[in-house]
């Protein structure tokens, strides 16, 4: 009995860390799609975020596990772990994207103007000025979502 519990606990930790590893950067990619000036991409990403945040995680996991079989006849019985990681990562990426969006939008416009006056381009402004402040702002929300 104890051996089964430790095996399950180990699997849970692996799922947790892999989900975190994939969903944190994917959330930033989703955020960039969400705020894209290319409207079709922005609409698609907004729909993705709404669907992922608006449906239960268990339903999404069932979709990722059983969906390929019922849609394309693919048997993925040996890929249970992959379906879990994929489903959890895509779900949490949507949540992290919204957390990042709220943190980045909370940065005052004066920060961007000051960076422009100092001669920074957009990527330098984001990575050297905005992102360090955003990390401090979003850390409590990200920690809450991780727990």
Kindly give the residue locations of the regions a language model identified.
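Transmembrane alpha-helices and adjacent helix-loop boundaries
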Residues: 1-147
């Amino acid at each position: 009995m104890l051996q089964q519990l430790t095996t399950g606990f180990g699997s849970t930790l692996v799922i947790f860390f892999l989900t975190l590893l994939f969903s944190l950067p994917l959330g930033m990619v989703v955020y960039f799609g969400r705020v894209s000036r290319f409207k079709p991409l922005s609409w698609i990403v907004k729909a993705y975020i709404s669907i992922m945040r608006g449906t239960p995680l268990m339903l999404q996991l069932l979709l990722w596990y059983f969906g390929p079989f019922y849609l394309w006849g693919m048997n993925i019985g040996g890929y249970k772990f992959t379906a879990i990681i994929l489903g959890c990562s895509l779900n949490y990426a949507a949540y992290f994207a919204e957390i990042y969006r709220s943190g980045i939008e909370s940065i005052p416009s004066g920060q961007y103007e000051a960076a422009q006056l100092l001669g920074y381009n957009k990527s330098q402004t984001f990575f050297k000025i905005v992102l360090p402040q955003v990390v401090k702002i979003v850390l409590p929300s990200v920690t809450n979502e991780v727990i």
